[in-house]
Design a protein with these regions (language model features):
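Solvent-exposed coil/turn segments that connect beta secondary-structure elements
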Residues: 5-7, 21, 26, 52-54, ...
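Surface-exposed binding/hinge segments that line
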Residues: 3, 9, 15, 22, ...
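Sec-exported extracytoplasmic/periplasmic mature domains
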Residues: 9, 26-33, 64, 120, ...
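Periplasmic solute-binding protein
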Residues: 1-11, 181-190
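Gly/Pro-rich hinge or "lid" segments in bacterial periplasmic/extracellular proteins
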Residues: 52, 62-63, 68-130, 140-141
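N-terminal lobe/hinge region of extracytoplasmic solute-binding protein
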Residues: 1, 26, 33, 95-97
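Extracellular/periplasmic solute-recognition and catalytic clefts
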Residues: 46-47, 105-116, 132-190
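Alpha-helical secondary-structure segments
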Residues: 17-26, 52-58, 100-101, 128-130, ...
Length: 190
């Protein structure tokens, strides 16, 4: 059973309440095959609105990574009910109004995404007013942009942004803070 924080709104002003959670979970479950890689999807027996700020998730079996998997952006990033098309997401969405500290302001495919601070965010406010995420698929271009000062941050070092050799070289150089986070879950193949 989840007790939702009161006073939280989506960036479009709609309330984040148990009904919004229900709508989002219904859409995720309706698209179950897209998310079959996530075991939690197959463990959901039902979910229900208890009251305006209480939502209950019932699983088929005890499942230890439930809270970890609910924290995954994909597929559990919730959007405002106004973004749904006919109460569904199967055919896309009308917008991307969420409850987080950032609002997607502009997006140019394969170029960049511009995020601005969400003034109505319920938590600690962002220290920056805007962040531009550049798409730079070439490892050498990323490294050059970092050294020239064209980018302030490189996110990801598992081969999708910088290869690990470049990451280790940057860490040894000492000019930049460099860290690798712990994984959120471990799996064993026997």
């Amino acid at each position: 059973t989840f007790h939702l924080r009161r006073g939280v709104t989506f960036s479009d002003g709609a309330p984040f309440d148990a009904e919004a959670v229900r709508l989002n979970m219904d859409a995720i479950i309706a698209n179950r095959l897209r998310h079959a890689w996530l075991d939690l999807i197959n463990e959901i027996e039902r979910h229900e609105v208890v009251d305006s700020h209480t939502w209950r998730l019932v699983l088929r079996h005890p499942y230890y990574p439930t809270l970890i998997e609910l924290g995954l952006l994909r597929p559990f990033r919730f959007i405002s009910p106004s973004c749904f098309i006919g109460g569904q997401t199967r055919d896309g969405v009308r917008g991307l109004a969420g409850t987080g500290p950032w609002i997607l302001k502009e997006h140019k495919e394969n170029q960049y995404a511009l995020f601005t601070a969400n003034a109505s965010y319920w938590g600690e406010k962002p220290r920056l007013q805007a962040v531009r995420w550049k798409v730079m698929p070439d490892h050498q271009a990323i490294l050059l942009a970092l050294h020239k000062g064209d980018v302030d941050l490189v996110f990801g070092a598992d081969g999708d942004m910088l290869n690990l050799d470049n990451f280790d070289a940057i860490r040894r150089e000492g000019r930049y803070a460099a860290a690798i986070s712990q994984p959120i879950a471990s799996r064993a193949i026997l």
